[in-house]
C-alpha cells in the first residue's frame, strides 16, 4: 500500500493502478467497521483507495474539528491489512485549495430532518467533501457504513445527480461485543460513558427489533419500549428516536403500524449524547 498526501501524488498513483477503482472515504481513527468497508471494496474492485480527511465543513466549530481523534500510524496498518492499495491523506488545502474556491454541494431533500435538523450545515459539508473526493479519485464505486443511515442516503442522492455514475454500496454495521456500533467517536467516551452508551443505544434498538419480530407493529408501542431504556440512564441524553420510510425518510406517525406504513423497509434511527459525544445508530425493519 502506498500513502500519498497531495493531489499530484494521487493522480500519479492512480494512473499506475488498474480499474475499476473503489473509494472508501473516512475521517480516520479507523476500526473494524472501516476494515469491513475496505474488505467489501476489495472483493469487487481492482484498486481500493482509502481517504482520511477530517472535513472542517461538516463540523459546527473548529473545536470539534480539533477534538476529532487522529491515529494515522495505526490507520495505515489497518488499511493495508484490510486490503487497501492506496491511502490518500490530504490536508485542507489539497481538498479546498485557496486558489480554487470550492462551492458547496447541495445535499438534497433527504438532508433536512434528523441529523440535518440537529446539525445545520452538516450534510452540506458531507456532500461537498464526498463530491470533491469523487472528483479527485474518479472511482467507479464507493463504500459507506449502514450505521450512518441518513448520510448514505444523502450520498446516494448526491451521486445520482452526477454524470459519472458512481455506484454507492452500503455495508452492514459492525458492532463491538457489547453491542455498541463501532465508531471513531467511541474513542472520546470515558469508561463510564462507554458502559452507559452500550447498555442503552444498542439495547433500545434491539428491543424494537425483537418486539417487531414478535408481532408488535405500533410505532407508539415500539417507541415506548426503547425510550424507557434510554431515559433510565441519566448520563445518556436522547436527541431523537425516529421511525421513517427507508427510501424517503418520510416519518411515520405515532399511530402508524410499521408493517402497513409503506412499501419496503422502515428505518429506525437514534441519536444520543454521552459525555458530550454525539452517537448515532440505526436499524431497519422489513
Give residue spans per PLM region:
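Nucleotidyltransferase catalytic core that binds NTPs
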Residues: 2-235, 244, 276, 283
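Phosphate/ribose-recognition catalytic cores of enzymes acting on nucleotide-derived substrates
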Residues: 225-286
Amino acid at each position: 500500500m502506498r500513502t500519498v498526501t497531495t493531489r499530484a501524488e494521487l493522480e500519479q498513483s492512480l494512473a499506475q493502478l488498474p480499474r475499476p477503482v473503489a473509494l472508501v472515504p473516512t475521517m480516520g481513527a479507523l476500526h473494524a467497521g472501516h476494515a469491513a468497508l475496505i474488505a467489501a471494496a476489495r472483493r469487487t474492485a481492482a484498486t481500493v483507495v482509502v481517504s482520511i480527511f477530517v472535513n472542517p465543513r461538516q463540523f459546527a466549530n473548529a473545536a470539534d474539528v480539533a477534538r476529532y481523534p487522529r491515529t494515522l500510524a495505526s490507520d495505515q496498518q489497518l488499511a493495508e491489512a484490510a486490503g487497501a492499495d492506496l491511502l490518500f491523506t490530504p490536508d485542507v488545502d489539497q481538498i479546498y485549495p485557496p486558489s480554487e474556491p470550492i462551492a458547496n454541494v447541495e445535499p438534497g431533500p433527504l438532508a433536512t430532518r434528523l441529523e440535518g435538523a440537529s446539525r445545520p450545515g452538516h450534510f452540506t459539508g458531507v456532500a461537498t467533501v464526498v463530491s470533491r473526493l469523487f472528483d479527485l479519485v474518479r472511482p467507479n464505486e464507493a463504500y459507506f457504513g449502514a450505521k450512518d443511515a441518513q448520510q448514505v442516503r444523502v450520498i446516494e442522492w448526491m451521486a445520482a445527480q452526477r454524470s459519472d455514475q458512481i455506484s454507492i454500496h452500503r455495508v452492514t454495521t459492525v458492532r463491538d461485543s457489547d453491542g455498541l456500533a463501532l465508531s471513531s467517536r467511541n474513542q472520546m467516551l470515558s469508561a463510564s460513558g462507554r458502559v452507559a452508551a452500550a447498555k442503552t443505544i444498542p439495547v433500545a434498538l434491539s428491543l424494537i427489533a425483537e418486539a417487531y419480530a414478535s408481532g408488535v407493529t405500533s410505532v407508539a408501542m415500539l417507541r415506548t419500549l426503547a425510550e424507557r431504556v434510554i431515559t433510565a440512564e441519566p448520563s445518556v441524553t436522547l436527541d431523537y428516536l425516529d421511525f421513517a420510510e427507508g427510501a424517503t425518510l418520510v416519518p411515520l406517525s405515532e399511530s402508524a403500524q410499521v408493517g402497513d406504513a409503506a412499501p419496503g423497509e422502515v428505518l429506525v434511527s437514534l441519536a444520543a449524547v454521552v459525555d458530550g459525544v454525539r452517537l448515532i445508530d440505526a436499524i431497519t425493519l422489513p
